């Protein structure tokens, strides 16, 4: 799959037609965090459930200063008509308005540039469609996380929200989040922080797990 972004790469400042008009990506993001997520096609079952859940969680992303934007190879007109189905799926008034815009990439220019095409899934003309990609960008416009799912597997937007919370926390504090971490759970002290410095940085206490190796690298502290 040509194109693509690596962690730390700056988001391209592309222009695109969307359901809220023409945008320039960096201007749209401003100083916010951003989630750019693609889906294979409008008017399809898995995509409808995904964007429905994304719409439900939009207030949670917004209060964390995260802007969302979707993308597929369908037209703006299709996006707007499909938005009615998404809102109806959510049990809401079937309007054309979603809490985030959807990009029209019917020429696949962005999908190719960003490495979003799924070679195993093709449209009626035999052309590959967009995979289920998630890119998370920081306020510096650099890629902080990427996830790539095939067309047959829907994403977990609650997990994407959890990841955002972790990324924002670890960007501000010298901690890491362990396996299955949830907001409010204890976090891990970075192994690069000396013991005495850790005591000053984390006044709520640092708790070290004793291990057979005798190495004191499993250090927990309450979430700052």
Swiss-Prot record:
| GO biological processes | cell redox homeostasis; lipid catabolic process; response to reactive oxygen species
Q: What are the N6-acetyllysine sites (modified residues) in this protein? A: 63, 209
Source taxon at top rank? Eukaryota
Q: How is it modified after translation?
A: Irreversibly inactivated by overoxidation of Cys-47 to sulfinic acid (Cys-SO(2)H) and sulfonic acid (Cys-SO(3)H) forms upon oxidative stress.
Q: What does the UniProt entry say about where the protein is found?
A: Cytoplasm; Lysosome
Question: In this chain, where does the modification Phosphothreonine occur?
Answer: 44, 177
| Gene3D superfamilies assigned | Antioxidant, Horf6, Chain A, domain2, Glutaredoxin
Which positions bear N6-succinyllysine?
209
According to the UniProt record, one GO cellular component term is: cytosol
Q: Does the keyword Mitochondrion apply?
A: no
How is the activity of this protein governed by pH, according to its UniProt record?
Optimum pH is 7-8.
Domain named Thioredoxin: residues: 5-169
Segments for region (Required and sufficient for targeting to lysosomes and lamellar bodies) = 31-40
Q: Reaction catalysed by this chain?
A: a hydroperoxide + 2 glutathione = an alcohol + glutathione disulfide + H2O; a 1,2-diacyl-sn-glycero-3-phosphocholine + H2O = a 1-acyl-sn-glycero-3-phosphocholine + a fatty acid + H(+); a 1-acyl-sn-glycero-3-phosphocholine + an acyl-CoA = a 1,2-diacyl-sn-glycero-3-phosphocholine + CoA; 1-hexadecanoyl-sn-glycero-3-phosphocholine + hexadecanoyl-CoA = 1,2-dihexadecanoyl-sn-glycero-3-phosphocholine + CoA
Record-level Gene Ontology MF annotations: 1-acylglycerophosphocholine O-acyltransferase activity; peroxidase activity; peroxiredoxin activity; phospholipase A2 activity
> Which residues, renumbered to this chain, carry the PTM Phosphotyrosine?
89
The positions annotated as site (Important for phospholipase activity) read 32
Q: What is its EC number?
A: 1.11.1.27, 3.1.1.4, 2.3.1.23
Binding note for cofactor: Does not need Ca(2+) as cofactor.
Task: Give any extra note attached to this record.
Answer: The active site is a conserved redox-active cysteine residue, the peroxidatic cysteine (C(P)), which makes the nucleophilic attack on the peroxide substrate. The peroxide oxidizes the C(P)-SH to cysteine sulfenic acid (C(P)-SOH), which then reacts with another cysteine residue, the resolving cysteine (C(R)), to form a disulfide bridge. The disulfide is subsequently reduced by an appropriate electron donor to complete the catalytic cycle. In this 1-Cys peroxiredoxin, no C(R) is present and C(P) instead forms a disulfide with a cysteine from another protein or with a small thiol molecule.
Fill in the subunit field for this protein: Homodimer. Interacts with GSTP1; mediates PRDX6 glutathionylation and regeneration. Interacts with APEX1. Interacts with STH. May interact with FAM168B. May interact with HTR2A.
What is the protein's given name? Answer: Peroxiredoxin-6
- This chain is encoded by the gene named PRDX6
């Amino acid at each position: 799959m040509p194109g693509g972004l690596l962690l730390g790469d700056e988001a391209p400042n592309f222009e695109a037609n969307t359901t809220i008009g023409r945008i320039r990506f960096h201007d749209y993001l401003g100083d916010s965090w951003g989630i750019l997520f693609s889906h294979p096609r409008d008017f399809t079952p898995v995509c409808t459930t995904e964007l429905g859940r994304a719409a439900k969680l939009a207030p949670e992303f917004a209060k964390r200063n995260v802007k969302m934007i979707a993308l597929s190879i369908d037209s703006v007109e299709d996006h707007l008509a499909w938005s009615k189905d998404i809102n109806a799926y959510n049990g809401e008034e079937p309007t054309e308005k979603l809490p985030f815009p959807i990009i029209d990439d019917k020429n696949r220019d962005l999908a190719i540039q960003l490495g979003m095409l799924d070679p195993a899934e093709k449209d009626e003309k035999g052309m590959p469609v967009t995979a289920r990609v998630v890119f998370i960008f920081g306020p510096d416009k650099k890629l902080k996380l990427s996830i790539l799912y095939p067309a047959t597997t829907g994403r977990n937007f609650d997990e994407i929200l959890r990841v955002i919370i972790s990324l924002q926390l670890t960007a501000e504090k010298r901690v890491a989040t362990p396996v299955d971490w949830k907001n409010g759970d204890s976090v891990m002290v970075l192994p690069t922080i000396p013991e005495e410095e850790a005591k000053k940085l984390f006044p709520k206490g640092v708790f070290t797990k004793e291990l057979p190796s005798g190495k004191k690298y499993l250090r927990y502290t309450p979430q700052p």
